[in-house]
A protein has these predicted regions:
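Membrane-embedded and interfacial regions of multi-pass energy-transducing membrane proteins
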Residues: 1-211
Length: 211
């Protein structure tokens, strides 16, 4: 899903969707919701790697007063934390789906950009040409998504997640998922937790301010 999301963002930059602020901002909100939902889903197996991943992230959020106590249900990652994460992981995809419909509405409201860069009276009709291509692409993505969801969860997960949680033993290295690597690199580079969080937040919001 994140591979397709990053491709979609690059396509939007190439086609200058940055100058369609409503479509662009709603897309960035969807991207942020994807990140939060993916992280919460990563924690849900409650294995050794996901537990310590949750510990690291909640420690980062400790720079925001009272947020960690509310999120964890206490002062450490424990059973109330997993219950809160499960509820959020169930709700956030529906929120993202609603914003996807808003995103599509804004796109149809203002129309798409012209990647060819010249004026012409010739228009390619949406039906049946583009609609057929969209349905074909959706079917292909849906098939890949089902295959990954049903058969690829265990092979693509970290072996340490098959180990029962031990709160007294940390993994040799907490390995982030590949789609978190840009944010992980920033947080590793900057010694200050608050500054690292602000820069990660700024990465997502900077394109909102320039749209």
């Amino acid at each position: 899903v994140f591979f397709l999301t990053y491709l979609h963002i690059l396509r939007g930059l190439n086609y200058s969707y940055l100058y369609l602020p409503l479509s662009w901002i709603s897309g960035l909100i969807i991207f942020a919701l994807f990140i939060v939902t993916a992280f919460i889903g990563y924690v849900l197996p409650w294995g050794q790697m996901s537990y310590w991943g949750a510990t690291v992230i909640t420690n980062l959020l400790s720079s925001i007063p009272l947020l960690v106590v509310w999120l964890c249900g206490g002062y450490t990652v424990s059973d109330p934390t997993i219950k809160r994460f499960f509820v959020l992981h169930f709700i956030l995809p529906f929120v993202a789906l609603c914003i996807v419909f808003i995103h599509i509405f804004f796109l149809h409201l203002h129309g798409s950009t012209n990647p060819l860069g010249y004026d012409t009276a010739f228009k390619i009709p949406f039906y049946p040409n583009l609609l057929t291509l969209d349905v074909k692409g959706f079917n292909n993505i849906f098939i890949l998504f089902i295959i990954q969801s049903l058969f690829g969860i265990i092979p693509l997960s970290h072996p340490d997640n098959a180990i029962m949680v031990n709160t007294y033993v940390t993994p040799i290295q907490i390995v982030p998922e590949w789609y978190f690597l840009p944010f992980y690199a920033i947080l590793k580079t900057i010694p200050s937790k608050t500054a690292g969080l602000l820069i990660c937040f700024r990465i997502i919001t900077i394109t909102i301010l320039t749209s």
